[in-house]
UniProtKB/Swiss-Prot annotation:
Chaperone is among the record's keywords: no
Entry's Gene Ontology cellular component terms: extracellular space; host cell cytoplasm
Organism of provenance: Monkeypox virus
Main location: host cell
Stated family: Belongs to the serpin family. Poxviruses subfamily.
Listed name of the protein: Serine proteinase inhibitor 2
Site (Reactive bond) location in chain: D306, C307
Function: Viral serpin that inhibits both cysteine and serine proteinases involved in the regulation of host inflammatory and apoptosis processes. Major anti-apoptotic protein which inhibits both intrinsic and extrinsic pathways and strongly cleaves host CASP1 and CASP8 but is a rather poor inhibitor of host CASP3. Prevents the proteolytic activity of host interleukin-1-beta converting enzyme (ICE) and ICE-like enzymes. Can also block apoptosis through host tumor necrosis factor (TNF) receptor.
Length: 344
């Protein structure tokens, strides 16, 4: 969650959408070739050996592509290449066709949702380029009826409001909790997909209460909040939205302590005999949330059957909120902030 917090704090008032799973995967690739303090700093983000194929099931599609492109004139070590397999490719960064080929690969992988990934020429001095792309599409376990979607006010701030297309579902059982913390009070709800993934939505009680929650959004806190969920009959209102994100993660990761990973400070002796540096780490994302499904690119948890009460509550996301798409095992696939309906 720390990468999301850092990006969110530097992009106040803007929508944010990233895939921690994808970012972790590409940092793991760099870790395989790192040495010394570079390897030590990257180890915090090393992805555990997990089979992401289990995320995919009927009505769900999740796939992740991570690539590291190295300059063709450099000689990369067999030990490094053996660990990453087809995730690595040597290219000529001075050839304009290289960018076209990379963009086409990502475009096909994300089914046209991210194009282009690289929208400007690379420096002729580029030695290494790390990219990540993710595609996710899943149907809601309980779809929103299109006939209930209507224009509804969304409060960007206490004094600013814009109309959005608000999806609604009435009187269904969802896992939900009202949370009280020293830094703010909020509601959290789980909107399950068919299969083993779900979207968690964190909605502050106050229109302008999201920032303090973001600052305290840690893995530990998030797990605690999820464990407090109880099945409740509830009316749910959430906007239809699309968000496109584009990030060069280098500065963000340096701020998080990866000071010896990028540029000339990186020690990748286990990757290549010659000096190489990681000059860019591009992360582009796309998400489309509508009545039938969620489609996401970067590049259902079990619902408790017993409800304690038949009293219907309401969860109305009519002001800025955080959303997290996760697998039933707790792995976070995506995390985002929706606060500005007019920017995407």
């Amino acid at each position: 969650m720390d990468i999301f917090r850092e990006i969110a704090s530097s992009m106040k008032g803007k929508n944010v959408f990233i895939s921690p799973a994808s970012i972790s995967s590409v940092l793991t690739i760099l870790y395989y070739g790192a040495n010394g303090s570079t390897a030590e700093q990257l180890s915090k983000y090393v992805e555990k050996e997990e089979n992401m194929d289990k995320v995919s099931a009927q009505n769900i599609s999740f796939k992740s592509m991570n690539k590291v492109y190295g300059r063709y004139s450099a000689v990369f070590k067999d030990s490094f290449l053996g660990k990453i397999g087809d995730k690595f490719q040597t290219v000529d960064f001075t050839d304009c066709r290289t960018i076209d080929a990379i963009n086409k690969c990502v475009d096909i992988f994300t089914e046209g949702k991210i194009n282009p990934l690289l929208d400007e020429p690379l420096s002729p001095d580029t030695c290494l380029l790390a990219i990540s792309a993710v595609y996710f599409k899943a149907k809601w376990l309980m779809p929103f009826e299109k006939e209930f979607t209507s224009d509804y006010p969304f409060y960007v701030s206490p004094t600013e409001m814009v109309d959005v297309s608000m999806m609604s579902i009435y009187g269904e059982p969802f896992n939900h909790a009202s949370v009280k913390e020293s830094f703010g009070n909020f509601s959290i709800i789980e909107l399950p997909y068919v299969g083993d993934t779900s979207m968690m939505v964190i909605l502050p009680n106050k229109i302008d209460g999201l920032e303090s929650i973001e600052q305290n959004l840690t893995d530990t806190n998030f797990k605690k909040w999820c464990n407090s969920l109880k099945a409740t009959f509830i009316d749910v209102h959430i906007p239809k939205f699309k968000v496109i994100g584009s990030y060069n993660l280098v500065d963000t990761l340096i701020k998080l302590g990866l000071t010896d990973v990028f540029y000339s400070t990186g020690d990748y002796i286990n990757m290549c005999n010659s000096d190489v540096s990681v000059d860019a780490m591009i992360h582009k994302t796309y998400i489309d949330v509508n009545e039938e499904y969620t489609e996401a690119a970067a590049a259902t948890s079990v619902l408790v059957a017993d409800c304690a009460s038949t009293v219907t509550n309401e969860f109305c996301a009519d002001h800025p909120f955080i959303y997290v798409i996760r697998h039933v095992d707790g792995k976070i696939l995506f995390v985002g902030r929706y606060c500005s309906p007019t920017t995407n």
